[in-house]
Structure formats: structure tokens, C-alpha cells
């Protein structure tokens, strides 16, 4: 039976109400509570009634990218311009048309149910609840290099030449704002690019970033702004008592230009103080405890860490499959080489260490889920190597070897080779992150007996699907398994319109 595709839908239920301003849904959340009682697992099914309220008006949104003139920044902006203007270009494969492939928001569908003939019905994810369209986003941002976006796009060598020629008139007048540059935090080989930097104390530079955000919002008549870090990977910041452990200590440390206050931390603090969502697309520990506490205090959304594009996304799928199948991965070896500026920066040991940490942790929750395969504290050998090879440019090569124990002492080895067009994979993820972060700000919910609606926790774990090392609220579970992360997005948005999660039981076809 073939699937049916629809662009829109109507929910026929007394539990869903559409007003001019809101979608209001009465939703029964079914979950399971467990207790360990004297070594016995007691399982209790729980039904909890919630009310979801989603604002229908889509705001005029701007995105400010830190690292605007990098490969990711130019690819995002150029890709959106090509889609908005309908630019087509020729390659040796023929005429190419713009699209948003690789975006879960723009190019994926969700199953809504089954008709009387057993045919599944799907709609685009972007049509489930009102969302910002990428074509309507206003872009700006900062960079330590002063190249205009047309020159930076040509330097990146990501787009085909014919498309670059058509984009130049649209991008040549876009220039980056001066950015924060502390040489100690990124590789020394980035110094020759740093010709567009702020000066002054750390407090003065942070205040300038705040002013930039305000000016950008006002000059473009925006309702909301998201700040996205897509700049160089920084080294990890040391967690120092009296410096970045509490809000008060952090603000005082900024006032005295403390050495361990990184550029990304200053951008995060500036964004939070301007009531602006901040997302960290690189692996460094921007979100030190004081920054997280500041976001919670101001109820400003933050998300991170590190875009999940090629190799890591496959790793989270493959490891989940192996462990779920009762197969025991005992060795995971991942090798990468790339030639873009990200690879150049990561060739420095301290910056590589930041990346190594986020890429290593991606299998942890899957390993911990199966104590039949793994004893307490047992973990696969997991090695990550990244090398800089200038000639391959943005075309990152990833090679992985998975060795697993199977039945009766046997071994299975899986070897993968993955050519990742790095920025072409990252750009749609950047769009997904900012669109999903915005839409969550328009969703409030409450338990049926509560008086007040509440927003999502400021630490946006909902974005985990798109990030290598997702940050979550304190004491919350970190989920890295990819399909669980995808189901979370889908099912929360379904709850907003009163639709049950897709449990795949298909009981109507089992009898």
C-alpha cells in the first residue's frame, strides 16, 4: 500500500481548539514510573493530563552568526538567498535547483495516522505547527576576518562556481561586525585571519556585543533574534572557583577581564542579558555553570553543544542498532581528515581535545542501557583522530571501524567510509536549530491542575537531535540515540495539536 502525502490537516477532536492567537490542546501524557523496592522493580503506569498552548503568529526573526564569514556562515546565508531568489545553476550533471535537503524541519515528513485501507498519511514536519520559514530569516553577525560574504564564500569553495557567480551580487554588500578575539583560545594558525577584532576590556567587548544585538534587532524591525556560535572551536575553559562557578563570580570576572573568560562565554552572557536565545555549535564548554545559571535566572533559552553532521550522526544510529540487537561493540575507531579552516584550527592539540570529548560521549547512554552486554563501568575502546589535509577542503573524509562481539565468542567488524561535504551538511542543521529554538519559545504548557502555564526549561534539550554533546537540565537524562531524539521533537509537536505519539504497535493490523 502506498503512502499518502498531504500539505495540511485538521484535527477532529474536542481536546483541540484553534483560536486566532493560539492552538490549545488537552493532552494525556502516558508514561511509566518505576521504583526499586528491596531489589524488586515496581512498575506503575501513569496518566498525567497536560494543557499545551502554542502561539500561532510566526515572528519576524533574525539570526546573528558568530563566524559569519566562515564556511558554515557563508553556506547558510548563500543557501537561503539561492532558495529565496530561486537561483538555478549548471554543473556537469546538468541544471541544479535550490532546496533545503538535510533540514529535518524543511525536508522531512511525519506520519499522522492510517486510513481505512491501511495507507499511512504523512505531512511535512514544518506544517505541523506554525514555524518560521528559512527564506524569511534576516542574517547578520560577527567575524574576526573582515571579508565581505561574497569574498568569504569564494574563499570557502563550497558552492559550485556557477552558483557563486549568481550569489556575488547578493552577498558582496554583507560585511561582518568586528568580533572578539583572544588568541589563547583558538589555534595560533588563525592569527593571520584576525583583522576585524574588538578592543578594550572584556566587559567593554561584551557590552559592544549587546549593542550589536540591539541595533540589529531595531534596524531590521525584528521580533526576535537567535545568536548562533559557528566560529572556531575554542580550547576548554578551566572551571575555576571564584571565576565561572556562580553568576556573581562570573560577572565580576568579566569586569576584571579574567583570563579564563572565553569569547564564546562573552557572547553567551551578552545574548542572555539581551533576552536572546544563544546556541553553541562548537564543542568547547561555553556553558560553564555560571552561564547556565544566568540563562535560568533570566529564563533565556540556550542550546548546545557542537553540530551533529556526518560521522557522529551515523555513529549514534549504528551503535544504537548494535546494542539494541544484543550485539556488543568493543572497539570504535574513528578517523577524519579535512582541509577547511575548521580542520586547520583543530590541528592544534587543545582545540582538538574539545572536539574529541564531544565525539567520544555520543555512545554513552546506549552503552549504559544494556547491563547484559556491559558490566558496571565497562565501555568500548573509543578512539578519535582528526587530521588537517588542505587539498580536500570542505570535503571531509570519515572512516570508521566497529568491532563487536557476537554469538559464542565470534566477532563482527563493520568498516565505513563517509565523504561529508562538511558545510553543506552543517548549514541545514543551523537552520533547524534556530527554527526549533524559536518555535519552542511560543509553546507553553501546564499540568491540568496548575494555575500558570510555563515555558520549556531554558536548557533546550529538545535540540539534542542536532548536537553531538547535548546539554540538558541538571539531573535530566542525556539522550544520544538518534531516533529517540527525533521522536522527541515529533511527539512534542504532535502533543501541541492533540495527536498521540506514533507507537508503531499497529494493533488494527495485528488481528
Curated annotation (Swiss-Prot):
Database matches in Gene3D superfamilies: NAD(P)-binding Rossmann-like Domain
EC code: 5.5.1.4
Location(s), subcellular: Cytoplasm
Alphabetic keyword roster: Cytoplasm, Inositol biosynthesis, Isomerase, Lipid biosynthesis, Lipid metabolism, NAD, Phospholipid biosynthesis, Phospholipid metabolism
Binding sites annotated in the UniProt record for NAD(+): 70-72, 143, 179-180, 190, 193, 230-233, 281-282, 306, 309, 340-342, 355, 393-394, 422-423
Reaction(s) this enzyme catalyzes, per UniProt: D-glucose 6-phosphate = 1D-myo-inositol 3-phosphate
Biological process according to GO: autophagy; cell-substrate adhesion; inositol biosynthetic process; mitotic cytokinesis; phospholipid biosynthetic process; regulation of phospholipid metabolic process
Top-level EC class as recorded in UniProt: isomerase
Family annotation (InterPro entries): Myo-inos-1-P_Synthase, Myo-inos-1-P_Synthase_GAPDH, NAD(P)-bd_dom_sf
UniProt pathway annotation: Polyol metabolism; myo-inositol biosynthesis; myo-inositol from D-glucose 6-phosphate: step 1/2
Lipid biosynthesis among keywords: yes
Cofactor entry: NAD(+)
GO cellular component, one term: cytoplasm
GO molecular-function terms, A-Z: inositol-3-phosphate synthase activity
Function: Key enzyme in myo-inositol biosynthesis pathway that catalyzes the conversion of glucose 6-phosphate to 1-myo-inositol 1-phosphate in a NAD-dependent manner. Rate-limiting enzyme in the synthesis of all inositol-containing compounds.
Family under the similarity heading: Belongs to the myo-inositol 1-phosphate synthase family.
Annotated protein name in UniProt: Inositol-3-phosphate synthase
Gene from which the chain derives: ino1
Amino acid at each position: 500500500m502506498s503512502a499518502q502525502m498531504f500539505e495540511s490537516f485538521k484535527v477532529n477532536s474536542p481536546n483541540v481548539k484553534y483560536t486566532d492567537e493560539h492552538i490549545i490542546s488537552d493532552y494525556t501524557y502516558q508514561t511509566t514510573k518505576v521504583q526499586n523496592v528491596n531489589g524488586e522493580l515496581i512498575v506503575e503506569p501513569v496518566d498525567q493530563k497536560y494543557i499545551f498552548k502554542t502561539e500561532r503568529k510566526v515572528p519576524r526573526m533574525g539570526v546573528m552568526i558568530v563566524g559569519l564569514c566562515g564556511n558554515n556562515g557563508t553556506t547558510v546565508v548563500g543557501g537561503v538567498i539561492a532558495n529565496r531568489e530561486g537561483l538555478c545553476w549548471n554543473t556537469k550533471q546538468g541544471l541544479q535547483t535550490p532546496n533545503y535537503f538535510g533540514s529535518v524541519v524543511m525536508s522531512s515528513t511525519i506520519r499522522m495516522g492510517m486510513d481505512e485501507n491501511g495507507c499511512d498519511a504523512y505531512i511535512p514536519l514544518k506544517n505541523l505547527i506554525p514555524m518560521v520559514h528559512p527564506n524569511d530569516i534576516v542574517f547578520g553577525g560577527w567575524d574576526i576576518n573582515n571579508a565581505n560574504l561574497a569574498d568569504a564564500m569564494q574563499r570557502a569553495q563550497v558552492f559550485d562556481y556557477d552558483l557563486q557567480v549568481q550569489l556575488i551580487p547578493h552577498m558582496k554588500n554583507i560585511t561582518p561586525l568586528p568580533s572578539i578575539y583572544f588568541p589563547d583560545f583558538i589555534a595560533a594558525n588563525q592569527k593571520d585571519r584576525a583583522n576585524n577584532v574588538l578592543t578594550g576590556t572584556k566587559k567593554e567587548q561584551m557590552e559592544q556585543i549587546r549593542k550589536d544585538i540591539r541595533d540589529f534587532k531595531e534596524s531590521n524591525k525584528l521580533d526576535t533574534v537567535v545568536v548562533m556560535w559557528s566560529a572556531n572551536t575554542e580550547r576548554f575553559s578551566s572551571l575555576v572557583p571564584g571565576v565561572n562557578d556562580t553568576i556573581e563570580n562570573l560577572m565580576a570576572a568579566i569586569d576584571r577581564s579574567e583570563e579564563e573568560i572565553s569569547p564564546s562565554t562573552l557572547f553567551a552572557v551578552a545574548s542572555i542579558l539581551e533576552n536572546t536565545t544563544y546556541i553553541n555549535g562548537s564543542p568547547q564548554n561555553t556553558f560553564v555553570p555560571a552561564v547556565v545559571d544566568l540563562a535560568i535566572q533570566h529564563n533565556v533559552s540556550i542550546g548546545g553543544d557542537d553540530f551533529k553532521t556526518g560521522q557522529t550522526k551515523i555513529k549514534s544510529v549504528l551503535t544504537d542498532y548494535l546494542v539494541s540487537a544484543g550485539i556488543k561493540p568493543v572497539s570504535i575507531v574513528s578517523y577524519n581528515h579535512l582541509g577547511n579552516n575548521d580542520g586547520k584550527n583543530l590541528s592544534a592539540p587543545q582545540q582538538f581535545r574539545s572536539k574529541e570529548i564531544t565525539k567520544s560521549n555520543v555512545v554513552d547512554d546506549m552503552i549504559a542501557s544494556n547491563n547484559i552486554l556491559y558490566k558496571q563501568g565497562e565501555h568500548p575502546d573509543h578512539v578519535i583522530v582528526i587530521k588537517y589535509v588542505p587539498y580536500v577542503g570542505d570535503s571531509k573524509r570519515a572512516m570508521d571501524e566497529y568491532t563487536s562481539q557476537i554469538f559464542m565468542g565470534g566477532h563482527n567488524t563493520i568498516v565505513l567510509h563517509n565523504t561529508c561535504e562538511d558545510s553543506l551538511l552543517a548549514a541545514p542543521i543551523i537552520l533547524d536549530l534556530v527554527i526549533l529554538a524559536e518555535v519552542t519559545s511560543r509553546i507553553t504548557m501546564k499540568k491540568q491542575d496548575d494555575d500558570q502555564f510555563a515555558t520549556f526549561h531554558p536548557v533546550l534539550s529538545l535540540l539534542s537531535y542536532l548536537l553531538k554533546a547535548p546539554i540538558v537540565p541538571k539531573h535530566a537524562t542525556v539522550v544520544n540515540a538518534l531516533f529517540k531524539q527525533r521522536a522527541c521533537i515529533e511527539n512534542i509537536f504532535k502533543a501541541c495539536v492533540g495527536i498521540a505519539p506514533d507507537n508503531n504497535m499497529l494493533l488494527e493490523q495485528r488481528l
